[in-house]
């Protein structure tokens, strides 16, 4: 079994669409997981952590939009929509939920791989931006803690943080996170 294949989750109640997507993606070298309802789709997303989820919006019981909200709240799985409607309100709701892309059915099979490839690059870029923002927040918070404790400016606080990380042979982000976590624990007491 090949372990370096990227996994894509398809959640669509239409078996023909599911089969089309699965065939095209497998030929392109992806491992494909399929679910015909949102609840099974969420279970697969939680247990298998696919690199991308392809969701239909209109499904019985739980919609793809509701599933997307659950993916945002419970996983880090990026998602796109392939749906039979192109209603503006659904497009706006999908965008607000964080959809990476949106295509309306019927889908030309030749569009699937380029759409998925671009969506995955976009998802990776967004994840990197989030990681950088989190790093900046943690370092900024640690600098703020140092400035509150010592009569120093921002540049001096950063230098102290940098020197401390170097002395510990640790990454500056790890030292910053430890400082912030320690302060949060002190605040809970």
Locate the predicted segments by residue.
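Short hydrophobic/Thr-rich beta-strand motif most characteristic of the beta2 strand and flanking loop
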Residues: 29-36, 44
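Conserved acidic segment of CheY-like receiver
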Residues: 2-16, 21-25, 53
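C-terminal output/effector regions of signal-responsive regulators
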Residues: 130-189
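The feature encodes the CheY-like receiver
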Residues: 18, 60, 83, 87
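Short amphipathic alpha-helix used as the core "switch/output" element in two-component signaling
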Residues: 43, 65-75
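Active-site beta3 strand of CheY-like receiver
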Residues: 48-54
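Acidic catalytic/metal-coordinating carboxylates
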Residues: 36-40, 61-66
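C-terminal output helix
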Residues: 89, 107-116
């Amino acid at each position: 079994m090949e372990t370096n294949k990227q996994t894509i989750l398809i959640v669509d109640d239409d078996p023909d669409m599911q089969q089309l997507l699965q065939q095209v993606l497998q030929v392109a070298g992806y491992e494909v997981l399929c679910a015909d309802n949102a609840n099974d789709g969420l279970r697969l997303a939680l247990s298998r952590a696919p690199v991308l989820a392809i969701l239909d919006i209109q499904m019985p019981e739980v919609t793809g939009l509701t599933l997307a909200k659950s993916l945002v709240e419970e996983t880090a799985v990026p998602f796109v929509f392939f749906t039979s409607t192109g209603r503006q309100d659904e497009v706006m709701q999908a965008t607000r939920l964080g959809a990476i892309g949106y295509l309306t059915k019927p889908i030309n099979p030749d569009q699937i791989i380029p759409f998925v490839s671009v969506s995955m690059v976009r998802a990776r870029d967004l994840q990197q931006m989030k990681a950088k923002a989190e790093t900046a927040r943690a370092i900024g918070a640690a600098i703020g803690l140092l400035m509150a404790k010592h009569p120093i400016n921002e540049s001096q606080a950063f230098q102290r943080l940098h020197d401390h990380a170097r002395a510990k042979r640790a990454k500056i982000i790890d030292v910053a996170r430890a400082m912030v976590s320690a302060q949060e624990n002190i605040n809970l007491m």
